[in-house]
C-alpha cells in the first residue's frame, strides 16, 4: 500500500514539474510576443513601400518597430514636399491657384497676358474710353476665344494683373473703379486727374486756338456742309475773359472753351444755339426740328419748361390786381389771429381782409398754383363777398 502511494506521488510530482517547465518556457520567451505585436506594423510598412518606391531602402528592425515607422513617415513627407517643389506654378494668377491649374498651361497664360497688355486692352480702352472691369471682361470674352476657357475668378485675376502691369503700355485707375489708357511716356505724377486744381499749368496745346489772342476761328457752314475759316474780331490784350465773351456774343458768334483733349476736332464743328447736343456737332433737338408743334419760349439750353410759362401768367395776374388796388396797404397774414382771435364772424373777416389780401394768401404757398386755379379762387372769393354784402 505504501509502494503504491509512493508511485502515485512520484507520478504527480513529475506531471507537475512538466507543467511548470512548459509554463516557464512560455513566460520566459518574449520574442514570440514581440513578433506578434510587430505583425501589423510590418504590414503597414509593406503597404507604404508598395505605394511609393522611395521607401524601398527603409531598414526594418524587428526589435524596434515603432522607430522604423516614425522614420518611414518622415521620409514619405519629405518626398511629397520635394515632389511639390519640383513643379512650381509661376503663372501670373498667383501661387494659391497652383492646385487648380496645371503647370503645363503656364506658357498659355503668359501668352494671353501679353495679348491683353499689348493688343486687346489698348484697343478696347481707346475705342470705348474708361470702362470698369466687368465691361472689360465682357469685351474680352467676345474678342478673345482663349479667354473664355478660364473660370470667372481666373479671368478677373488675369485682367487685374494685366491692368496693373508696369511694363510697356500702362493703364491707370480713375474714380469708381474705372480704368483708362495712359501713355507710357507720361509719368504717373503728371496725369491731369492726379493733380490738384490750383497746380494745373495754364498752358494751351499748340493746335488749340486761344480765346485771347486768336486771329481765326473755325465754323461750319450749314449750306455747303464744309468747314471754312471765318475771321474773328481782334480782342484787346487788357480785356478780361468775360468782356471778350460779351464782345463775341454781341457780334453774333457763340463762344466755347477748348479744355477737352479733342478740342482740335470739335473746333471745326458749329455750335448750334439752343441745342443740347451742340458738343457733338450741332445736332438739333426734336423741339427745334419741329417748332410748330410746341409753344412757349426756349431757354438757351433748348429745354422747354411749361412751369415757367405758368409762373409768368401768374405774375401778370398779380400785377394787374396790384395796379387796380395800388392804394391798399400790404397785408400780413396771421393764421392764429384769423382762426382764433376776435368775436367777429367769417363774413366780417372777409370784409376786413378784402379781395387783394385773399389773393395774396394764395401767393404765400411755396408752390404757385396754375392760372386756372387762381382764377377759380378769385371767382369764389368775389361770390362770397357778394353773398355777404347781400345779407
Curated annotation (Swiss-Prot):
Q: Does the keyword Cytoplasm apply?
A: yes
Q: Where is the composition biased (Low complexity)?
A: 90-105
Q: Where is this region: Disordered?
A: 1-29, 85-105, 189-253
Q: Where does the protein end up?
A: Cytoplasm
Question: Which residues does the record list as Phosphoserine (modified residue)?
Answer: 194, 199
Q: Name one GO cellular component term.
A: cytosol
Q: Name one GO molecular function term.
A: DNA-binding transcription activator activity, RNA polymerase II-specific
Composition-biased stretches, type Basic and acidic residues, lie in 16-29
Renumbered to this chain, the Polar residues biased-composition regions fall at: 189-201, 209-229
Single GO biological process annotation from the record: positive regulation of transcription by RNA polymerase II
Which controlled-vocabulary keywords does the entry list?
Cytoplasm, Phosphoprotein
The protein's matches in Pfam families, at most eight in alphabetical order, are given as: Stb3
Among PANTHER family, the record links this protein to:
PROTEIN STB3
> Family assignment?
Belongs to the STB3 family.
Write down what this protein is called.
Protein STB3 homolog
Supply the source organism for this entry: Schizosaccharomyces pombe (strain 972 / ATCC 24843)
Taxonomic path: Eukaryota, Fungi, Dikarya, Ascomycota, Taphrinomycotina
Gene name linked to the record: stb3
